[in-house]
Amino acid sequence: MTRLAFARSLLVVAVLATGTNAGAATADPDWPCVQRKVPQLSLGQVWNGPDLPPSAKDWSDDASVSALVEDVAARRLPLGDAQKKIRDFAASLPAEQLAPKMAMVMQGMFDHMDAERSHVISGISRYAHRQLEMAADLRKQASDVDALRAKPDADPDEVERRTDQLNFATRIFTERAQSLTYVCDVPTIIEQRLYQLAKTVSETLAAKK
């Protein structure tokens, strides 16, 4: 297979892969994931406990709660370790502080992780939009190389140079498309982690009743 044929085959596969997913689960043309785009979560999607009091929104003013939220929200911390931190924190509280403090923990986790998730979703849309721009540019490059090769007086060295450039750009495009597949899972991973952490908070409250 010639360099140009290889580049064109890569380009066709990559562009088709991008086009297959783009907007698959939403009307947003910049959304490339098969997962449905939900820019923001609602508290009710992850929390089955009692209604949180208005004071829970002040969670960031409490240093201990804020530090716990920061720790358990980090995906680098294994889920089991994060759940243990929540249980240990609840166990350290006086009985009269358990409900208000854990409500703040829940509100804090929701605010922090929902914001992180929304940030990831925005990044995915920007990334996908750039992919569409790159795909259009690659199609133009391939067309230009075809036109150059069709010229009777085409410089073979120039054809080879332009073809190598197209090959390289197409590989970059394909690698980015493959990376996007993994990134698309991140919003769901964050949502599932938040749900499990919320369940742990609910269990600490139920245990003290």
List the model feature ranges, each with a label.
Residues 1-10:
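Bacterial N-terminal signal peptides that target proteins for export
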Residues 93-122:
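Short, charge-rich amphipathic alpha-helices with coiled-coil/heptad character
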Residues 118, 125, 129, 136, ...:
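Heptad-repeat alpha-helical rod positions in long coiled-coil/spectrin-like domains
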Residues 24-99:
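N-terminal Sec/ER secretory leader and immediately downstream segment
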Residues 120, 127, 131-149:
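Non-transmembrane amphipathic alpha-helical segments
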Residues 140-168:
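Short E/K-rich amphipathic alpha-helical oligomerization segments
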Residues 157-209:
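Alpha-helical oligomerization segments
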Residues 9-19:
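Bacterial N-terminal signal peptides
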